[in-house]
Every structure is written in C-alpha cells, then in structure tokens.
C-alpha cells in the first residue's frame, strides 16, 4: 500500500484528437463573405455587425437594429402575435414558417412599433432577412400598412429598414397585392404631410424595392447594399448587354440619382436624428414633412 503512494507520476497529459482541436462551437466565429477574414461573433456584434477588417455590412437582426437606434426602454412593439397562414395550401409552407420562427425568434419577417430616436418619437418598421429571406407576404404587408396608419393617426414620422428578397411566392397574388396596399397607405400618409424615411439594406429586391422601399421622402441605403427588381442575369439576357460590375449596388443607385445618400451604419443614428430635427414642428403640431 505504501509503495502505491509514491508511484512516479506520468509527465504527459492526453492530447485532444485532431477532430476535437478543430471543432469550434457554432456561432462563436463569423467569416466575412467579402474579405474572408474570420472574427469573433461577439466582436462583430459590438461593431454593429460591420466587418472589423474591410467594413462589410453584415445583415443585422431586426431587434438588434432597433436596440442600436432607439432610446433605451422607448420601444413598444405593434402586432407581435400576427402570424402567416397557408391560404393557397402550398406544400411544406407551414413547416418552413415554423422552422424560421424557431431559428430567428421572430413571428414574421418584419418587426413594427413605436419609440424614440434621440428623443424624437417615431413609428419604425425593420425587416429581417433571416425569416423567409425577408419576403413580403400578407402579414408583412399588413403589419407595415398598420404601422403607417398609426404614424398618420399619431402624427409621427415613419422610418423603415428594408431587407427582402421580394414578394413571397407561397402566397401568390396575396403577396403581390401588398405592394399596392402598402403604397396606398404611404400615399395617404404623404398627402397628410407625413415624413417617411426609407433605409435600404442588403438585399432590397423584387416587389419590396418596387413599392414602399423606394417611396421615402428620404431614400437612404447602407454601403454595398444590393438594390434592384429583377436579377442581374435576367436583365443581361433581356437587354443583351453586359452590365457594370457595380450595377444594382447602393453606390450605383446614388450615382444615378436614385438615392439621397449612402450612409455607414455607424453614422446612421446621428444622421437620422439630424433629419428628424430638421422636420420637427413645435408645440402640438407634431412631426410633419411640410
């Protein structure tokens, strides 16, 4: 027994297997699609999901976007429990919606509500491309329309951040009619003098780009955002011409007069606060464009 107490200890420790050494928990690291650099996801989030190496603007979840812009504790969400059904009986659609709800933590591809930005009250809508690629179905269109109507009733500015692949094919014509419905609501809002600010993020395409995304009194975009209706390849085949390398980027649209400004994400809050300052009315008159 005494001999066992003084057994010489081994001078090595077991090494992890080759597979274990290369396994990193999912979500800890993020690879930039532009510069291919790998960075800690926590550091990327701290930097508002702007690449620390090349400045690429990664997609930003809707709730992160709201938290980064609005004053602490000011946000009150609208229509949080509104969810899509399957009006056309499209095979597998309900299952895909449930999967996206589980992965994104959202009930739909847009979050709407009211809050304050640097003390300025407003109504806000933020689309999230992690839910059905931000596609616009009947619920997305309804939530945006209701948000615009509330902004009109309460005489507050309306701010939207778009990120979408276009109309949702699983809902057919019901998704296409949202283009007209949202645009009509914005027309009524504009006729009453309402201030509408649209910020297009990557990507803003299809029926969203062809409707409410482009109707702002101010049309802004983030750097490098893909903005357009049809895809590049479809357009090239139609016009039988090779398109410029920067075609359908935010910078291309700015150069051709379709945007008012391309704004870095780090400067967005300050810029929006300045715009709201310019359009504020005193007393009880509210916040109006005119």
Curated annotation (Swiss-Prot):
Catalytic activity entry: N(6)-carboxybiotinyl-L-lysyl-[protein] + acetyl-CoA = N(6)-biotinyl-L-lysyl-[protein] + malonyl-CoA
Cofactor: Zn(2+)
EC number(s) per entry: 2.1.3.15
Gene Ontology cellular component annotations, sorted alphabetically: acetyl-CoA carboxylase complex
Residues that hold Zn(2+) according to the record: 32, 35, 51, 54
Subcellular location per the Swiss-Prot or TrEMBL entry: Cytoplasm
Primary location group: cytoplasm
One GO-annotated biological process of the protein: fatty acid biosynthetic process
Function of the molecule: Component of the acetyl coenzyme A carboxylase (ACC) complex. Biotin carboxylase (BC) catalyzes the carboxylation of biotin on its carrier protein (BCCP) and then the CO(2) group is transferred by the transcarboxylase to acetyl-CoA to form malonyl-CoA.
Family: Belongs to the AccD/PCCB family.
Name used for this protein in its record: Acetyl-coenzyme A carboxylase carboxyl transferase subunit beta
Organism of this sequence: Geobacillus kaustophilus (strain HTA426)
Gene name of the encoded protein: accD
């Amino acid at each position: 027994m005494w001999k066992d107490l003084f057994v010489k200890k081994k001078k090595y420790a077991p090494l992890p297997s080759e597979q274990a050494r290369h396994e990193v928990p999912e979500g800890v690291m993020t690879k930039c699609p532009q510069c291919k650099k790998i960075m800690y996801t926590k550091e990327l989030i701290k930097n508002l999901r702007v690449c620390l190496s090349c400045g690429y603007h990664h997609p930003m979840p809707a709730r992160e976007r709201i938290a980064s812009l609005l004053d602490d504790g000011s946000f009150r969400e609208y229509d949080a429990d509104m969810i899509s059904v399957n009006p056309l009986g499209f095979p597998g659609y309900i299952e895909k919606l449930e999967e996206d709800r589980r992965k994104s933590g959202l009930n739909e591809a847009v979050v709407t509500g009211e809050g304050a930005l640097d003390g300025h009250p407003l109504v806000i809508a933020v689309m999230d491309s992690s839910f059905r690629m931000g596609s616009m179905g009947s619920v997305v269109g309804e939530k945006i329309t209701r948000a615009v109507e509330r902004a009109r009733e309460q005489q507050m500015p309306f701010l939207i951040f778009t990120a979408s692949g276009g109309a949702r094919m699983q809902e057919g014509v019901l998704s296409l009619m949202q283009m007209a419905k949202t645009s009509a609501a914005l027309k009524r809002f504009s006729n009453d003098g309402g201030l509408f600010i649209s910020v297009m993020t990557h990507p803003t395409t299809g029926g969203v780009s062809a409707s409410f995304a482009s109707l702002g009194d101010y049309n802004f975009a983030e750097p490098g955002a893909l903005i357009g209706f049809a895809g590049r390849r479809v357009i090239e085949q139609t016009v039988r011409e090779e398109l410029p390398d920067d075609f359908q980027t935010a910078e291309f649209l700015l150069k051709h007069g379709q945007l008012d400004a391309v704004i870095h994400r780090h400067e967005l809050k300050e810029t929006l606060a300045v715009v709201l300052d310019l359009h504020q009315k005193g007393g009880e008159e509210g916040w109006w464009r005119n």
